[in-house]
């Protein structure tokens, strides 16, 4: 059975666990509509991505 040769220090253990924390999602303000959206994602309200219409928008009644 594999056994660690040395005890893991608290610093090394903490550095390993630092990647486990949940990260806050980032949002950017859309230049055209002013809505908040995720970076590199299309704007669902307008259907635009990088200045092009990529999604047909449903009309709200």
From Swiss-Prot:
InterPro entries: Ribosomal_bL32, Ribosomal_bL32_bact, Ribosomal_zn-bd
Biased composition (Basic and acidic residues): 17-44
Region of interest: Disordered: 1-61
Stored SUPFAM superfamilies: Zn-binding ribosomal proteins
Pfam (any one): Ribosomal_L32p
One Gene Ontology term, aspect cellular component: large ribosomal subunit
Family designation: Belongs to the bacterial ribosomal protein bL32 family.
Name the UniProt record assigns to this protein: Large ribosomal subunit protein bL32
The species this protein was found in: Afipia carboxidovorans (strain ATCC 49405 / DSM 1227 / KCTC 32145 / OM5)
Native organism taxonomy: Bacteria, Pseudomonadati, Pseudomonadota, Alphaproteobacteria, Hyphomicrobiales
